[in-house]
C-alpha cells in the first residue's frame, strides 16, 4: 500500500474513529482503504466479486474451507477475473492432515520450530509474537509480486497456498540443515553466535544499561579494543 498500489481491506467491524482508534489498526492499515462487507449475504458477495473483477490480487487468511463455503474461492474468482492472483494464508496450508487446524502467531511460531530455538538454555521457549505475523505477511507480499511477474510474462494468474508454519521454518534454515546432516537437535543458546565473538548484548557499568557489540573479524576486534582504550588486547 506504500508502493503506489490501491489496497482495499474488508473489515469485520466498523473501525473506530478519532483518538479512540487502536494504534495497531493504524500501523497495519497504513494507506489502505477499508470496506465493511457481510460476504455471507448475497449482496455482500456480489460487491466483493465486482471488486475482484477490477483487481490484480486477492489475499485472504480465512480458516481453510471458509472461502469455499462463502463462494469466494479461487475457482469462483476466476469466473469474474480469469487472470486473478489469489494468495491464501493459513497456519498449516490448505492440504494435509493439519490443514483444518487454525492458528495464530504463537501457534505457528512453535510449529515452525522458531520458538523452540529462541531463548536461553536454562529457560523456556520464547515467543517473538508480532514479528512472526509480519514475516508471514511479507512472504505473502513477495509471493503476490512473483505471481504478478509471472502473469506479466505469461498472461496467466495463479493460486498461492501459503503456510505460515512453513514461512516460520525459513527463519531456522541453518538449524534444519544441521539436523538433517547430523541428526543433532539444535538447542537454545541465548544471544550467543558460535562463529563470532564478542557478538552479544552486554551489561554496562555506567549510565547506559546495555551495549550491543558485534565483531566478525580481527580488524573489527582491533577497532573495538581501541574504542575501549584497551589496545593491549589487540
Residue spans for each PLM region:
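Aromatic-enriched alpha-helical interface/lid elements that frame and gate functional surfaces
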Residues: 198-234
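Mid-domain beta-loop-alpha active-site segment that forms a flexible
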Residues: 130-145, 164-172, 216, 220
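Short Pro/Gly-enriched beta-strand edge/turn motifs at strand-loop
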Residues: 9-12, 180-187
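Short Gly/Pro-enriched turn/cap motifs at secondary-structure boundaries
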Residues: 186-194, 201, 213
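N-terminal helix-loop segment corresponding to the beta1-alpha1 unit
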Residues: 2-143, 147-156
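Beta-strand segments within the central parallel beta-sheet cores of soluble alpha/beta enzyme folds
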Residues: 157-165
Amino acid at each position: 500500500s506504500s508502493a503506489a498500489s490501491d489496497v482495499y481491506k474488508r473489515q469485520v467491524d466498523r473501525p473506530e474513529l478519532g483518538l479512540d482508534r487502536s494504534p495497531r489498526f493504524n500501523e497495519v492499515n497504513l494507506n489502505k482503504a477499508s470496506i465493511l462487507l457481510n460476504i455471507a449475504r448475497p449482496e455482500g458477495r456480489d460487491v466483493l466479486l465486482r471488486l475482484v473483477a477490477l483487481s490484480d490480487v486477492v489475499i485472504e487468511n480465512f480458516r481453510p474451507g471458509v472461502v469455499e463455503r462463502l463462494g469466494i474461492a479461487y475457482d469462483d474468482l476466476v469466473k469474474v477475473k480469469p487472470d486473478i492472483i489469489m494468495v491464501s494464508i493459513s497456519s498449516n496450508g490448505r492440504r494435509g492432515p493439519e490443514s483444518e487446524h487454525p492458528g495464530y502467531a504463537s501457534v505457528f511460531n512453535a510449529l515452525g520450530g522458531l520458538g523452540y530455538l529462541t531463548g536461553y538454555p536454562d529457560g523456556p521457549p520464547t515467543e517473538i509474537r508480532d514479528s512472526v505475523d509480519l514475516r508471514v505477511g511479507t512472504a505473502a507480499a513477495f509471493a503476490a509480486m512473483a505471481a504478478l511477474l509471472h502473469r506479466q510474462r505469461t498472461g496467466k494468474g495463479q493460486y498461492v497456498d501459503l503456510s505460515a508454519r512453513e514461512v516460520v521454518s525459513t527463519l531456522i534454515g541453518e538449524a534444519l540443515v544441521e539436523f538433517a546432516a547430523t541428526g543433532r537437535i539444535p538447542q537454545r543458546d541465548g544471544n550467543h553466535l558460535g562463529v563470532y565473538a564478542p557478538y552479544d548484548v552486554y551489561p554496562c557499568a555506567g549510565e547506559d544499561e546495555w551495549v550491543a557489540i558485534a565483531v566478525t573479524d580481527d580488524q573489527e576486534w582491533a577497532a573495538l579494543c581501541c574504542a575501549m582504550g584497551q589496545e593491549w588486547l589487540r
